[in-house]
């Protein structure tokens, strides 16, 4: 299922080189360039506040965007670099790369948990503890999944859900090789306390013997 790709609206930048870049910054714009995809590089610029907001939101360099530039066809891009001022740590330039539908990219995909009402552990008062709300996958640009689905049907207290338990979209794989944890069904705090007390009593009895 294709994800809804966010738009990134930029403007064509008049001229290239340091002079044009400085002129853009004086106008409160951040200069950039989009390259790749069997097309010539295109000098672009984006309002400073717009880029800063995107950067603060996170995942800017791992989000697929639909680049919209007046006078040019929309194209899918991903950020390859954001240069920053060494003193102020604020963006001074950015690079975007055009993608083909067959391009492989790393993206964070959200995880959705379904059938909570069929989860035995939750019915008994257990708590769903989400370790990873997103998972970074290597995906194909033309077939980006909207989400990963975890079915909680039949899960009991103490069950741990690993990435190997999740059906991944065809052609995608995690960026991490190990079988990491997505979530678990933990015991309610009251039950944990009772178990801890019982374990403590058992230990005391064993010591007395």
Swiss-Prot record:
Q: What is this protein called?
A: Large ribosomal subunit protein bL25
Family statement drawn from the similarity comment of this UniProt entry: Belongs to the bacterial ribosomal protein bL25 family. CTC subfamily.
Query: What GO cellular-component annotations does this UniProt entry give?
Result: cytosolic large ribosomal subunit
What keywords tag this UniProt record? Answer: Ribonucleoprotein, Ribosomal protein, RNA-binding, rRNA-binding
Annotated Acidic residues bias: 196-209
Extract the ranges annotated as region (Disordered): 190-209
InterPro entries per record: Rbsml_bL25/Gln-tRNA_synth_N, Ribosomal_bL25/Gln-tRNA_synth, Ribosomal_bL25_b-dom, Ribosomal_bL25_C, Ribosomal_bL25_long, Ribosomal_L25_dom, Ribosomal_uL5_bac-type
Q: Please tell me whether the keyword rRNA-binding is annotated for this protein.
A: yes
Which one GO biological process term can you cite for this protein? Answer: translation
**Tell me, what is one Gene Ontology molecular-function annotation carried by this entry?**
5S rRNA binding
State the HAMAP family in the record.
Answer: Ribosomal_bL25_CTC
């Amino acid at each position: 299922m294709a994800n809804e790709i966010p738009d990134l609206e930029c403007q064509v930048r008049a001229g290239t080189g340091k002079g044009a870049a400085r002129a853009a910054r004086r106008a409160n714009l951040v200069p950039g360039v989009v390259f790749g995809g069997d097309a010539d590089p295109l000098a672009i610029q984006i309002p400073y506040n717009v880029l800063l907001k995107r950067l603060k939101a996170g995942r800017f360099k791992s989000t697929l965007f639909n680049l919209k530039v007046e006078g040019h066809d929309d194209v899918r891009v991903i950020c390859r670099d954001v240069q920053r001022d060494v003193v102020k740590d604020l963006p001074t330039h950015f690079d975007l790369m055009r993608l083909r539908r067959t391009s492989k990219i790393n993206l964070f995909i959200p995880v959705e948990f379904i059938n909570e009402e069929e989860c035995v552990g939750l019915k008994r008062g257990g708590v769903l503890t989400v370790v990873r709300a997103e998972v970074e996958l290597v995906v194909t640009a033309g077939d980006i999944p909207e989400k990963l689905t975890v079915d909680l049907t039949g899960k009991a207290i103490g069950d741990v859900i690993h990435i190997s338990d999740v059906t991944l979209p065809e052609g995608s794989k995690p960026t991490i090789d190990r079988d990491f944890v997505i979530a678990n069904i933990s015991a309610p705090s009251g039950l944990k306390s009772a178990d801890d007390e019982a374990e403590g009593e058992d230990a005391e009895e064993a010591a007395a013997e």
